[in-house]
Amino acid sequence: MELLKERIRRDGKVKGTDVLKVDSFLNHQMDVELFAEIGKEFKRRFADREVNKILTIEASGIGIACVAAEYFHCPVIFAKKSQTKNIAGDVYTTKVESFTHGRVYDIIVAKEFLGPGDK
């Protein structure tokens, strides 16, 4: 997506040799108009697919996922990075390495929100 590439070139900041900071428009301060364009692009690319849920991980993915979900008219589920008291019972879990935090998380999603028929 050219709009996103241009925004990264203009406002992204390189830290060291392996980190691209996009916190001024993507994951700390969020440019909702940019997110809307990204959501439209997801809809265009997946227009021929049945999408009934969007799954992301907390925290940076939530904003874009919510805007994209408006174009697909579906709910968003986000994987949590830690167990909480209000998630009990059957859950999906896997390990995910966070490049920016330099650690591994055991992420979880309640099975009641993500089933075998979801796309």
Language-model features and meaning:
Residues P75-K119:
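Short, glycine/charge-rich flexible loops or terminal/linker lids adjacent to PRPP-binding catalytic cores
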Residues K40-F42, G63-I64, D106-V109:
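A generic local structural motif
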